[in-house]
């Protein structure tokens, strides 16, 4: 990053610590020690004042940063350090200075931890599983903190802080390349490769070889509750991969309900299709339906209860259980398809007999005069889907032929 840095306030940090601009490193330490204890939030101090003290101490005890601050002020440091985002945590500086028990016990501050990633798995289940409820055991591999070193990666109590980056993992390279010109680059610390820690070969944990984690196989019992939906999530909190200084993420199972050969589900209702004959549609029927829990349901219509093609009948409380209220269920809908007899099955006598039984034909009878004025037609059986495909192909072929005619060379008349 290049830019001309204007001069700004270069006395604020000295005033915050209450020292002159000529203060030595020992004087800075003494001033910080006194002010930090007084203003620590655990002692009722102002958190913003405590933060300012830490920033001032961090800048003025770093010779390179102090030189830039003395020449160009606070704004130059902010521009050169990515908007000031590279300051260390003020509590970290305090604990490095005093240790963890400055007030006779461990600090009440909990170090902010990043959250680990969740791990999602698709779990295929049957419609029977979500109707009856079921349990599945799944074996998974995951990383856990090494039990021998407790995730430190070392034999000793804790790894050493990297001297190259002071535990940050990144190094800021700042150079003055001209009058009022500063070059700033941020790179991964080559000493610790971004970890902020240094572990010697002799101090590496023999169990995890300083990786801090080991692999574990774990069996999870996944309970599919009655009435769960396609796409619903089952969450195992804190069961994903563990890592140091990280809040462990969750393992998430996403239900994928497989298509059933007979039943279809819509919310808490179930649908089935049933094909019946014309005789059954007119004179009644009965059949046995095996439900998702293997119960046998008797489905019937009494003689004279006419079933029309495409008609639906509902059976209460035989649909899906409500999730969370499994004793309440939706409805089971039966859609009826009526299969008519083939042409030629009925004789003329049978047709006349049916006419006597069935309701009369609607409308009036055509007279001989009406018939004489009409042209007689003949109807043929047709597969309408096949007919539409044939028509579509024919239209495409005609359009292709027209394009070829337009692209053909035209014959020019000879000039006289």
Swiss-Prot record:
GO MF term (any one): unfolded protein binding
Binding site for Zn(2+) 1: 146, 149, 205, 208
Bias (Basic and acidic residues) ranges: 380-399
Domain J: 12-73
Zinc finger residue extent: CR-type: 133-217
Region (Disordered): 380-416
Pfam families assigned: DnaJ, DnaJ_C, DnaJ_CXXCXGXG
Up-regulation conditions: Induced by a compatible race of the rice blast fungus (Magnaporthe oryzae).
CXXCXGXG motif repeats: 146-153, 162-169, 189-196
GO biological process: defense response; protein refolding; response to heat
Subunit structure as annotated in this protein's UniProt entry: Interacts with ZFP1.
Its biological purpose: Involved in disease resistance. Acts as a negative regulator of innate immunity to the rice blast fungus (Magnaporthe oryzae). Acts as a negative regulator of the pathogen-associated molecular pattern (PAMP)-triggered immunity (PTI) response through the inhibition of reactive oxygen species (ROS) accumulation and expression of defense-related genes. May function via the ubiquitin-proteasome degradation pathway.
Remaining remarks: Plants silencing DJA6 display enhanced resistance to the rice blast fungus (Magnaporthe oryzae) and accumulate increased levels of reactive oxygen species after elicitation with flagellin (flg22) or chitin oligomer.
Protein name per UniProt: Chaperone protein dnaJ A6
Lineage: Eukaryota, Viridiplantae, Streptophyta, Embryophyta, Tracheophyta
Gene name of the encoded protein: DJA6
């Amino acid at each position: 990053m290049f830019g001309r840095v204007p001069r700004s306030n270069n006395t604020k940090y000295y005033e915050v610590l209450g020292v002159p601009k000529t203060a030595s490193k020992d004087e800075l330490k003494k001033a910080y020690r006194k002010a930090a204890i007084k203003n620590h939030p655990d002692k009722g101090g102002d958190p913003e004042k405590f933060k300012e003290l830490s920033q001032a101490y961090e800048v003025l005890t770093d010779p390179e940063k102090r030189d830039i601050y003395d020449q160009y002020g606070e704004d130059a440091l902010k521009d050169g350090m990515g908007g000031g985002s590279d300051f260390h945590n003020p509590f970290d500086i305090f604990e490095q200075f005093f240790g963890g028990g400055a007030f006779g016990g461990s600090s009440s501050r909990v170090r902010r931890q990043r959250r680990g990633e969740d791990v999602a798995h698709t779990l295929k289940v049957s419609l029977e599983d979500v109707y009856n409820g079921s349990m599945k055991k799944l074996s998974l591999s995951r990383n856990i903190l090494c039990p021998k070193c407790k995730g430190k990666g070392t034999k000793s109590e804790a790894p050493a802080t990297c001297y190259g980056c002071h535990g940050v993992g990144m190094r800021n390279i700042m150079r003055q390349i001209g009058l009022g010109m500063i070059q700033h680059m941020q790179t991964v610390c080559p000493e610790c490769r971004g970890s902020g820690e240094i572990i010697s070969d002799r101090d590496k944990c023999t169990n995890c070889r300083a990786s801090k984690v080991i692999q574990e196989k774990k069996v999870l019992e996944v309970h599919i509750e009655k009435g769960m939906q396609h796409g619903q999530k089952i969450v195992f909190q804190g069961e994903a991969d563990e890592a140091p200084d990280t809040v462990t993420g969750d393992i998430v199972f996403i239900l994928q309900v497989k298509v059933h050969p007979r039943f279809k589900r819509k919310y808490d209702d179930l649908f089935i299709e049933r094909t019946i004959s014309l005789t059954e549609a007119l004179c009644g029927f009965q059949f046995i339906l095996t439900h998702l829990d293997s119960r046998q349901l008797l489905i019937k219509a009494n003689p004279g209860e006419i079933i029309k093609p495409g008609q639906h009948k509902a059976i209460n409380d035989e649909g899906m259980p409500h999730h969370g209220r499994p004793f309440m269920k939706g409805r089971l809908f039966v859609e009826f398809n009526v299969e008519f007899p083939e042409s030629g099955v009925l004789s003329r006598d049978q047709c006349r007999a049916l006419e006597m039984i069935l309701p009369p034909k609607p409308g009036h009878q055509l007279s001989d005069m009406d018939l004489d004025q009409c042209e007689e037609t003949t109807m043929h059986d047709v597969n309408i889907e096949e007919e539409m495909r044939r028509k579509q192909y024919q239209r495409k072929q005609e359009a292709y032929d027209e394009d070829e005619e337009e692209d053909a060379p035209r014959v020019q008349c000879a000039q006289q």
